[in-house]
Regions:
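SF2 helicase motor core recognition
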Residues: 216-221, 267-271, 425-429, 453-457, ...
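Conserved Walker A/P-loop ATP-binding site and its immediately adjacent core
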Residues: 134, 144-165, 268-273, 420-422
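Walker A/P-loop
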Residues: 118-138
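Charged, low-complexity
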Residues: 13-121, 165, 170, 191, ...
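Interdomain linker/hinge connecting the two RecA-like lobes of the SF2 helicase core
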Residues: 119-122, 235, 241-242, 270-271, ...
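Conserved P-loop NTPase motor "coupling/switch" region that bridges the ATPase
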Residues: 144-147, 165, 169-172, 180, ...
Length: 581
């Protein structure tokens, strides 16, 4: 009988097999890409190697001698991973110890132990559970240094301080420029604990390099292959594969022995985003993009960049069982956080603000819906609709938001207010300054430098400011607010439910002593009704993957994906125009 053959080409297994074997192969590997009759391609992952090895026991397939050792190495890697995952569920399992200045909690040791055994792990523990400390545990294991920590711009100093607390013997360095330089340069640094300036000379490669996502692309050639471990903090930043930071992250991750991603919200919008986050965490473990789309998203998916996972709970379960993701809730880690109450409160919106942009937005909406102009012009029109309608809605609500927050402050609350447009911050701030008893506030938005943001945080935490006005997308990773505030107000809405959860997580986290209130102040006009509807659809994707065993873990809804088209339709309908469905 003719035997088939397995070889490797471009990081993929190429399997040539006779017809009767091909039929069975397709049944087992439904996502295999078919080149021609009897020839298939699969991502060369340990899991696929393990399955192919099992398949070879039953069907005639020879292995190219040139890849025999590589194939066996991949099979063994998967068997070690399965054993490590199984061990965690065994009675009497005790995770390894980690020598830190502040002893880690057991659940942190469990995740760190699993990451070291598997080589790639997404830690999606609930917000405020100490994921950074979990990552720092791994720094003390043999063969892990040097480490690269990639985080958001405003969190680089916070990471340096955390490492100094937990592992003070490690030498850390925050990249200070987007232009690569030698680590042996003479420079002035500020001690993260004492705040004193000092002139130092690095002794070559530091133990831990801390970089923000914006600088990563410039440093990829200097860091790829030079660091053994990479930590992607707030890994939802890597959810889009067409960005420079994603490409740089993937290039560095592929050269590392250990990859750990940290985020409680790996999905902001659509299920396809989990593939990109997992590709930098455990490259190829979810197969190729085509395999993932075919097997997890189904045929009726529309735009691949907005593809929804057909059964989010099933994918979430698989990620856990395969040792690719670990997530613990407050109950799992036995750290009770006070109750969270979410209130959707309708407020008045100044219709005059919406009327100012109504005519222009209607023209743009018709251009989008009727496909007038080039694709670029329609894309620009869609962006302009989004910007103008959300801004006008935010401005129209600003007065009502300020009045609402003033009542909270007068009742003794210190309030964290989330918005998006600078005009909205300005109007709310001006209202605070006009009101009889002025309300001191601090700004933590996209305009402030990291130092200014740190000062704003200090003023709020120390009580100099009663309100912290913060950007919807600037708060990820920010810690310390939970000790002084229990009240969150959304002055504006984001299109992504993950953004809202990140915002709420600034106060609803470990260390919070009181029940938390989160107020969504929404208008019945403008962009709020459409955004609210879209948020429900997207949350179905995130919730199922994040918590597949939750009683309300939903199956993806079948509603349309094009949020701007829906906003455009709403604009025209409210002005009495006929819109074809």
């Amino acid at each position: 009988m003719k035997h088939g053959r397995i070889t490797i080409r471009d990081a993929s297994f190429v399997v040539e097999a006779p017809a009767h074997v091909s039929i069975r192969l397709r049944r087992l590997f439904g996502g295999a890409q078919r080149y021609r009759a009897g020839v298939f391609q699969l991502a060369a992952t340990p899991e696929h190697a393990h399955d192919l090895d099992w398949f070879r026991d039953r069907h005639p397939l020879d292995i190219d001698p040139a890849i025999e050792s590589k194939f066996r190495e991949l099979v063994a890697a998967h068997e070690r991973k399965l054993a490590a995952i199984a061990a965690i569920d065994e009675v009497g399992y005790v995770p390894r110890e980690f020598e830190l200045a502040i002893p880690p909690r057991e659940y942190q040791r469990v995740a760190a132990d699993l990451a070291l055994k598997t080589g790639g792990l997404l830690i999606a523990d609930v917000l405020g559970s100490g994921k950074s400390a979990t990552a720092i545990c791994t720094f003390t294991a043999p063969g892990v240094l040097p480490v690269l920590v990639v985080t958001m711009t405003h969190l680089t100093l916070q990471w340096q301080r955390e490492i100094a607390r937990f592992a003070p013997k490690l030498r850390t360095h925050r990249l200070r420029s987007g232009r690569p330089y030698a680590f042996s340069d003479v420079k002035v640094e500020v001690d993260p604990m004492t705040k004193r300036r000092r002139v130092v000379r690095d002794r070559g490669m530091p133990d831990v390099v801390i970089c923000n996502y914006q600088k990563l692309h410039s440093w990829v050639e200097s860091l790829a292959g030079k660091v053994r471990t990479v930590i992607f903090d707030e890994a939802q930043e890597l959810r889009h594969e067409d960005t420079n930071k994603y490409k740089a992250a993937l290039a560095i991750a592929q050269e590392c022995d250990l990859r750990v991603s940290l985020t409680a919200t790996p999905i902001y919008n659509y299920g396809i985003e989990i593939l990109n986050v997992m590709n930098v965490t455990a490259p190829n473990q979810l197969g190729t993009r085509r395999e993932f789309l075919d097997e997890w998203c189904g045929e009726s998916r529309g735009d691949d960049n907005k593809a929804k996972v057909a059964d989010p709970a099933a994918l979430g379960t698989y990620l856990r069982e395969a040792g690719l993701m670990i997530r613990r809730t407050h109950k799992d880690i036995r750290r009770e956080v006070p109750e969270l109450t979410i209130s959707r409160t309708v407020v008045e919106c100044d219709v005059a603000e919406l009327n100012k942009v109504a005519d222009d937005v209607a023209v743009l909406a018709r251009r989008v819906l009727d496909r007038i102009g080039s694709p670029l012009e329609r894309m620009q029109a869609a962006g302009e609709i989004d910007y103008r309608m959300r801004q006008a809605t935010g401005i129209g609500k600003a007065g009502a938001v300020a009045d609402f927050v003033r009542l909270l402050v007068e009742s003794g609350e210190r309030v964290v207010v989330f918005a998006w447009h600078h005009e909205v911050y300005s109007l709310i701030g001006a209202a605070f300054e006009r009101q009889g008893a002025q309300i001191p506030y601090a700004l933590y938005t996209g305009k402030e430098t990291p130092a200014a943001k740190d000062e704003a945080r200090r003023r709020f935490v120390e009580g100099e400011a009663k309100v912290l006005l913060i950007s919807l997308r600037s708060g990820a990773g920010l810690d310390g607010l939970q000790f002084v505030s229990r009240t969150v107000v959304f002055a504006e809405l984001d299109w992504s439910p993950g953004v809202h959860w990140q915002c709420i997580g600034r106060v609803h986290r470990d260390g919070q002593a009181d029940p938390v209130m989160a107020y969504y102040l929404v208008a019945e006009q403008g962009s709020d009704p459409v955004i609210s509807d879209v948020l429900g659809i997207k949350e179905a994707q995130a919730a199922g993957i994040r918590d597949p065993e939750a009683a309300d873990a939903p199956i993806a809804a079948g509603a349309g994906d094009d949020q701007i088209r829906r906003l455009a339709e709403d604009v025209l309908k409210r002005r009495g125009h006929v819109v074809d469905n």
